[in-house]
Amino acid sequence: MLSRVADSLYWINRYVERAENISRFVEVSEAMALDCPPGSAEPWLPLIDANGERELFDQLYPTGNSEEVVRFLVRDEKNPSSLVNCIGVARENARQIRDVITTEMWEQINDLHWSIQEGERFWDQPPQEQLREIRRGCQLFYGITDATLSRDHSWQFSRLGRLLERADKTTRILDVKYFLLLPSPEDVGGVLDELQWISLLRCAGAYQMFRQSRQQMIEPKAVASFLLLDPSFPRSVRYCLERIKDTLRIVSGRSLPGAPDALECLSGLTLARWSYTSIDELIADGLHEAIDSLQSDLNSLHNLIAQRYFVAASLSPSDLSPPLAAGQMSASQMSASQQQASQPPDGPAADTIIPANPTAAELSPANLAAAKPTTSKLTQTASLHN
């Protein structure tokens, strides 16, 4: 498999997972706002912190009311992580590798993108219906991917992107709950506190499974233990880490035991730390510090994966840069650019890879709409390392 193809598959699924999470976060928060007692703090700003976009939001919306938060998270073109932009970037990455993904996958992500971009009927719906339709569209894409894509490297890199994004968002929303939603001790244990813990479980899509597996009162320790350490819930951190380790082993092609490299060491050590600990130990040592350390490990895993599989082998270590950085070109992009230099432009180059942290201009509807849905040609790039 080409590095460029693996890169696109990875980011398609990260962005679809991110969009699905945002739609669920906003949908749950809107429902929770109706149940909050009069005069209570609105549950909106923590969503900005969970997505790591507080500085940008404060610049764009100094007042920070609920309508502005929803607009920023869902439709704002200036927010590179807004729901609409995530779907647009996922669709553009899918367009570039249409000869690799299945027709059903392309049709689903393309339909979802254009229903958001051009459908007046879509935005005329109540907000809850809009978010529910987007969430279901993302989940349908997961189902189509699992049902139609062969269990080769294409599927493994798709799953890898989804799992890393899922683990990251689970830790972020849990961290926000512990240290941002309830700054005053008098709120702990009250009605608002219980509502917030229920909303946290719903944000993670975990409310019913928590009720079935734990069969106990909703209290902070039990919720944290379920989201972090449960081995069978598909959105728990431990579950994601186990599948990440398995996926990396399959992708590496290592069949014989040997000295593990940096990527295998980090994935194994991270999984071990979260498999052989208890929630009491995590809380005693500082849950916030443990989550911070885990997020750092997840970022390091992403960087190592990008350096091994998404950067051409011919590059020297000094040439390595953060994956999909805005404005940068990979070896395959430069090769494609040279091949197409004599051709008249007809939209974005087929081998252009959308950045992981794109600028607002790169994500504008006009720029995304300019892309023609034609199958890209595979350029000759370095194969994945085995």
Question: For each of these PLM feature ranges, what is it?
Answer:
Residues M1-G327, D346-T359, A371, S376-N386:
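Alpha-helical transmembrane segments and their helix-helix packing motifs
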